[in-house]
Regions:
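Terminal, low-structured helical/coil segments at or just beyond the last alpha-helical repeat
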Residues: 121-156
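Hydrophobic face of amphipathic alpha-helices that form TPR/SEL1-like repeat modules
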Residues: 19-25, 41, 52-59, 63, ...
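Short helix-capping/linker turns of helical repeat alpha-solenoids
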Residues: 43-47, 59-61, 66, 79-83, ...
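Sec-dependent N-terminal signal peptides
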Residues: 4-13
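N-terminal leader/linker segments that initiate helical-solenoid repeat arrays
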Residues: 15-36
C-alpha cells in the first residue's frame, strides 16, 4: 500500500518537472524537442501540456500554424479547467479564426469560465466581447456558463 501512495505522490512531481523542462525548451527556441516532451504528457491528459501544444500550433512554433489543431488542443485543456486555454478558446470563438464564423456567445462563455478559473486577463476580454453582444446573446451565454461551470468547476 505504501508503494502506491509513494507513486501517487511522486508521479505528479515528475510530470510537473517535464512540463517545466518543455517550457524551458520553448523559451530557448527548441520547439521540436519541446513537442517531444509535451506529447506524452498531453496524451495522458495533462492540461498544461495540452495548452502549450495549442500555443505551438496557434503561433506556428516548431510546427506549421494550424488553427484547427490549436483550437482542439486548447479545447481539451479547457474542459479540464485550464484558465489560459479557456481564454484561448474564447479568443478563437471571438475572432472566428479556424472556425466557420465568430461565435460571441461561446466566446463570452469561455472568457467567463476562464475568469472563474483565475485568468486575470479573461475579465478584460469578457468586458470587450460583451460590448458586441445583444441582451439575448448574453442570456444564452449564461445558460452555457451554468452548464459548464458545474462540470468544470464543481466546487466553485
Amino acid at each position: 500500500m505504501l508503494k502506491y501512495v509513494i507513486i501517487l505522490i511522486v508521479l505528479p512531481i515528475i510530470a510537473a518537472a517535464e512540463i517545466e523542462h518543455a517550457r524551458d525548451l520553448m523559451e530557448e527556441g527548441q520547439f521540436e524537442k519541446a513537442m517531444q516532451e509535451l506529447l506524452p504528457a498531453a496524451r495522458s491528459g495533462n492540461a498544461d501540456a495540452e495548452e502549450l501544444i495549442g500555443i505551438m500550433y496557434a503561433m506556428g512554433l516548431g510546427v506549421k500554424r494550424d488553427d484547427i489543431r490549436a483550437f482542439d488542443w486548447y479545447l481539451r485543456a479547457s474542459m479540464k479547467g485550464h484558465p489560459g486555454a479557456q481564454s484561448g478558446v474564447g479568443w478563437y470563438y471571438e475572432i472566428g479564426r479556424g472556425l466557420p464564423a465568430p461565435d460571441l456567445i461561446r466566446a463570452y462563455t469561455w472568457y467567463v469560465l476562464s475568469a472563474i478559473g483565475g485568468d486575470p486577463d479573461a475579465a478584460i476580454s469578457q468586458e470587450e466581447v460583451v460590448k458586441k453582444m445583444t441582451r439575448e446573446e448574453i442570456e444564452k451565454a449564461h445558460v452555457l456558463i451554468n452548464d459548464y461551470k458545474v462540470w468544470i468547476y464543481p466546487f466553485r
